[in-house]
């Protein structure tokens, strides 16, 4: 077996419509086709690929107290526009430059408390 990359991220939420709005309106993903599963959800796309899957759950269950997913990360193309968009959405975030590199990072949480890292690497 060889892992070739990350296919998608799945988030369980009891706030499906608001979570869709966050990923669509704040982070700029596009809502797209989703198989006709027997449960509610949404798939959000970037560059034609469904990278965020949302599943509506009455009581989402997080990781055990023995382990945790700290965050996941997206690459972004416009650092300043991203800061402007997050500020306009009245979201709290932390932004900083990675020492010794040209990488700039922004950390923000969605309404479910999921930590998202946004990485900007100038070309």
Label the predicted regions:
Residues 1-17, 48, 69-72:
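N-terminal beta-strand motif that seeds the catalytic metal site of vicinal oxygen chelate
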Residues 5, 38, 68, 102:
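Exposed loop/turn and edge beta-strand positions of beta-sandwich/beta-sheet ligand-binding modules
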Residues 10, 30-36, 96-99, 123:
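Conserved catalytic-core motifs of GNAT/GCN5-like acyltransferases
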Residues 12-51:
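Core segments of cupin and vicinal oxygen chelate
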Residues 37, 47, 79, 99-101, ...:
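A short, compositionally biased micro-patch
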Residues 72-84:
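Mid-chain, well-packed structural core segment of small domains
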């Amino acid at each position: 077996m060889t892992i070739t990359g990350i296919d998608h991220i799945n988030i369980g939420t009891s706030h499906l419509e608001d979570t869709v709005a966050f990923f669509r309106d704040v982070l700029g993903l596009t809502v797209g086709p989703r198989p006709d599963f027997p449960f509610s959800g949404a798939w959000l796309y970037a560059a034609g690929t469904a990278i965020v899957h949302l599943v509506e759950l009455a009581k989402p269950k997080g990781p055990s107290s023995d382990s945790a997913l700290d965050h996941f990360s997206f690459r972004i193309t416009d650092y300043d526009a991203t800061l402007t968009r997050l500020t306009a959405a009245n979201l709290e975030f932390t932004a900083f430059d990675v020492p010794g590199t040209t990488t700039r990072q922004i950390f923000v949480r969605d309404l479910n408390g999921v930590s998202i890292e946004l990485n900007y690497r100038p070309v």
